Amino acid sequence: MASMAVLGSLIRRQADVNETRLVLKPDDRAPAKARDRVSGLRSSLGPRFDDVLLVVSELVTNSVRHSSSTKPIKMLVQISGSRIRLEVSDRGSGFEPLHSMGGGGLGLMIVDRIAASWGVHTNGSCTVWVEISKLPQMATGPDSSQDQSPARFRQPGG
């Protein structure tokens, strides 16, 4: 009887997880295809839809631009409880996040501002993962009007 209760709990937990995967050719159409897939999750993503769409677009674009591999790009979007997890994997060699934040574009700075946490795993491939809270963080307290970005990202005169 106890095993039935555990099985029921596992089934309920799986029902609470909404997951989609996509395999993409590493070409200029990949970011648009990734955005199209995320668009199908609009109701599940709630108020974070635009943020997730932007992060997925940035990560897939980076994968297309910076991985020299012709192997497919893999994307995962997983919605579970109060969190959204994104993963974009390619056969590239990876990168050091701290050294990549000041590069040619703003993509990783945007990811850093939206994400609750993010990082890179390398093990024969490169996976950039991002965790986003399902509910947007609201600014509170007396300093909420202040720019909270790290000093290295502030604009001159800001």
Q: Where is each model-derived feature located?
A:
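Short, well-structured hydrophobic secondary-structure segments
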Residues: V55-R65
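Conserved beta-strand-loop-beta-strand hairpin that lines the nucleotide-binding pocket
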Residues: M1-R21, V64-G158
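Conserved short strand/loop->alpha-helix "switch" segment adjacent to the catalytic nucleotide/phosphoryl-transfer site
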Residues: P31-S57
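A short beta-loop-alpha structural element at the N-terminal edge
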Residues: K25-A30
